[in-house]
Amino acid sequence: MWSMCWVLRAHLGLLFWVAVIELCAASGPATIMASDCCENSLSSARLPPDKLICGWYWTSTVYCRQKAVIFVTHSGRKVCGSPAKRRTRLLMEKHTEIPLAKRVALRAGKGLCP
């Protein structure tokens, strides 16, 4: 089951509530915040494919606008990538269990967002 998570973030020394609703796997790793997702981090991480576990996340609101997919490594490190990039799609297809409809959308370059 999915649970709703509200995120409290610190930004430039000021605390404020961020109106971001995240979809978090109930039995998954630690909550992933919007700040954990950065452009090009998948390509800059240079992680070999066998270091990625089969967990993957797709979210609504902020992440979908960025078309971000977050992989969690065996060491617990979070790696973010864009499904629009061929390398990310190949890694996702090889190392995740993706429903057929979303797999077809990925191959067509449509990403995971509706």
From Swiss-Prot:
SMART domains listed in its UniProt record: SCY
Keywords: Signal
One of the GO biological process terms: immune response
Signal peptide: 1-26
One MF term in the entry's GO annotations: chemokine activity
Assigned GO CC terms: extracellular region
Keyword Signal among UniProt keywords: yes
Keyword Signal set for record: yes
Functional summary from the UniProt entry: Acts as a highly selective agonist for human lymphoactin receptor XCR1.
Protein name (database record): Protein vCCL3
Gene behind the chain: K4.1
